[in-house]
Each structure stands twice: as structure tokens, then as C-alpha cells.
Amino acid sequence: MSAFACSAVAAPARGAIKANSSSVCAIENGKAVAVGTSKQVGAFKPVFAAAKAAKATTFSISCSAASDEVPDMGKRKLMNLLLLGAIAGPTIGAGGPFVSFLVPPKSGGGAGAGQAAKDAAGNDIKVEKWLETXKPGDRSLAQGLKGDATYLIVKEDGTLEKYGLNAVCTHLGCVVPWNQSEGKFMCPCHGSQYDRTGKVVRGPAPLSLALAHVNVLEDGVVAFEPWTETDFRTNTAPWWK
């Protein structure tokens, strides 16, 4: 069985906020259970509590495999919970808008009217505040179209990229973390990889990550809008239409 060590870091941070998955081996009825038992463990509670205390609005996630094996289905579900649960943490108790993040979307795309990007507390993201903590090269998750976890990208000049990337892997729907050291999005479930623009560079994922337009409204709110034109990475029609 593959082991993963995952950490969630909140900003503004009061020290690192971490959760180690080594004590968890499976998901039982949607909840983490301890190795060899059916007793539920509170592996995520310290992350949620610390994030709430820090009044964090952005999170970065890092994961590293303890072996090169492909994680089993329990690990896959656990990874999704860790990646998105860290974002949902401040609002789980109140049943806030990020609770839906705990269930991977059935579709990787997004269609319909543009909508405000939401932060970890479920509030509209204001570009000025976001850029105070998200530095050049940053790729952090926000709630996007259809509630999908979507990366906002900060360019090297410190401004927001004009597109966002749907974080759902096009293989089997895992949430794909950004690997800063490798400069790629690397899926922990079956090894698919995507470059900085979300273009697939290694299977088994068959397609690139879905795109969404990113606009800044007059009041400074960041908004996502559906991407319906040609995919600039492949020069083809968008598969997520």
C-alpha cells in the first residue's frame, strides 16, 4: 500500500498547519478510519481548527509519496479529502458553501453564467487581497464554475492569469495538486501529469485540464466565466463544452 504525507499551509499563517495521513488507511462510509480498526479518527480536525483560528483565506497543498506505487482507492479518496477538506475546513461546522468540495464533481468542465470566485470562507475573492498572500507563480484553489475546485494562477509580474484551471483530473476525477518543485500538476492517484498551463503531458489522463476565463470586475471581485472558444494549448475545440 502506498503512503502519502500531506500538509496544508494557510495564509496568513500562524505557523504551518499540517495533517499527516500516515495514521489513516481507508475511507469508511465517507469518513477516515484508523489502520486495522473501524474507529473513526480525527485526522483532519487539527487542520480545520488551526485554519479557522488563523482566519485563513488561501491554502497551498503539498503531497509527497512515500513510495512509487499507485495509491489504492482508499488513498485516492483520502487525498481528495485532504486537498479539498483543507479548503472546506473553516465552514464545515456551519455547512458552508465549500462543503460540496468534499465530493469530487462528476464533470470536469463548467458551463453557464460567470460567477464570483469564492475563497476558503465562502466569500467573494477580491483581487487585491488575494495578491497580498498569493505571490508570483502561486497556484491556489478557489471555488469555481459549478462548484469545481479551480486554480487561480499568479503570473510572474504579480497579476492574475486570464484563465483558471479546473483541478479535476480528466482520468478518474481525482483532485490534482500543483508540484512547485517539478513545475507540474501531478495526480497522486494514477500518475497523470499536466504542465503549467494544465496541458496533459503524461497519461493515463486523456485530456488537458478544463479552462475557465478569469476576469476582475469593477469592484475588484474575481469572477470565472465559461471558456467556450478554442483551447489555446491544443488548438482544438474545448472538450468540456
Swiss-Prot record:
Binds 1 [2Fe-2S] cluster per subunit. Residues 127-223 form the Rieske domain. [2Fe-2S] cluster binds at residues 169, 171, 187, 190. Disulfide bonds join 174-189. GO terms for molecular function: 2 iron, 2 sulfur cluster binding; electron transporter, transferring electrons within cytochrome b6/f complex of photosystem II activity; metal ion binding; plastoquinol--plastocyanin reductase activity. This is Cytochrome b6-f complex iron-sulfur subunit 2, cyanelle. Its EC number is 7.1.1.6. The lineage of its organism: Eukaryota, Glaucocystophyceae, Cyanophoraceae, Cyanophora. It catalyses: 2 oxidized [plastocyanin] + a plastoquinol + 2 H(+)(in) = 2 reduced [plastocyanin] + a plastoquinone + 4 H(+)(out). Its cofactor is [2Fe-2S] cluster. One of its GO terms (cellular component) is cyanelle thylakoid membrane. This protein is 1 of 2 subunits of the cytochrome b6-f complex that are encoded in the nucleus. The Rieske iron-sulfur protein is a high potential 2Fe-2S protein.
